[in-house]
């Protein structure tokens, strides 16, 4: 897009520029609309986005792809029209640099291409002991935990029942992860799902005050509070 390299403070252009770019892409109706990076400032646009236009673009074949702050767009599309979007790589941070410099590997690139073409048959991931054998069907939704939490209580937060909620985050200490997950639990969101899938929570700093407290501690505690499989 013509505005892809714009800059304004921390953002890829001012609000009007970025809003126009989102709408321009939706009008163009490409097969794939991929975020350049994470999507800083997207929450500023949520009340102004023409959601009918974006939902229509999905119905006409556009696959909106991104993660991190782009989670806001995924949730908005689901909330305003039940539209399917894709939590996936970004053009610059992932596909735009080699694997050894933090980009994605060839297997991920191939899987992504198959997913976009509709040829991907299955994906796999490791689970903790005791979680094997679950067979579930439901709306797969979620994304960045901080973004999911920030949108609760807004009209852009989808009301998903019997879904499979996946969550990830970066640069957040385990206690912040626990606090965010408990907020979802106390708001009743976790109990309404069939399963919670926790992805990678990376690049946080440990503290001497943790005294053994870590992500495993968070998950173990959460399982004592939540009946939904994690």
Which residue ranges define each predicted feature?
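Conserved anion/nucleotide-ligand pocket segment
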Residues: 82-149, 153
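Short, acidic/small-residue loops that bind anionic groups at enzyme active sites
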Residues: 51-76, 84-91, 225, 229
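N-terminal glycine-rich "phosphate-gripper" loop used for MgATP/nucleotide binding
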Residues: 32-43, 47-48
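ATP/NTP phosphate-donor binding region
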Residues: 1-29
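Short glycine-rich anion-binding loops that position phosphate/pyrophosphate groups of nucleotides
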Residues: 37-40, 172, 201-202
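Oxyanion-binding "anion nests"
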Residues: 140-184
């Amino acid at each position: 897009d013509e505005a892809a390299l714009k800059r304004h403070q921390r953002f890829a252009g001012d609000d009007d520029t970025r809003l126009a770019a989102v709408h321009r892409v939706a009008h163009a109706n490409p097969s794939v609309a991929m975020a350049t990076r994470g999507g800083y400032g997207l929450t500023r646009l949520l009340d102004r986005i023409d959601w009918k236009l974006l939902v229509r673009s999905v119905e006409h074949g556009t696959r909106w792809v991104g993660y991190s702050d782009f989670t806001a767009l995924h949730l908005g599309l689901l909330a305003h029209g039940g539209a399917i979007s894709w939590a996936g790589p970004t053009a610059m941070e992932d596909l735009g640099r080699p694997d050894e410099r933090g980009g994605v590997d060839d297997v991920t690139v191939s899987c992504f291409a198959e997913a976009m073409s509709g040829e991907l048959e299955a994906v796999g991931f490791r689970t903790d002991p005791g979680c094997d054998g679950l067979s579930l069907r439901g709306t797969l939704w979620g994304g960045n935990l901080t973004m999911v939490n920030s949108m609760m209580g807004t009209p852009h937060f989808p009301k998903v029942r019997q879904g499979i909620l996946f969550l990830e985050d970066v640069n957040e200490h385990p206690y912040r992860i626990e606090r965010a997950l408990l907020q979802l639990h106390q708001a009743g969101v976790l109990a309404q799902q069939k399963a919670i899938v926790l992805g990678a929570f990376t690049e946080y700093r440990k503290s001497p005050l943790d005294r053994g407290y870590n992500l495993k501690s968070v998950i173990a505690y959460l399982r004592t509070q939540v009946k939904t499989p994690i």
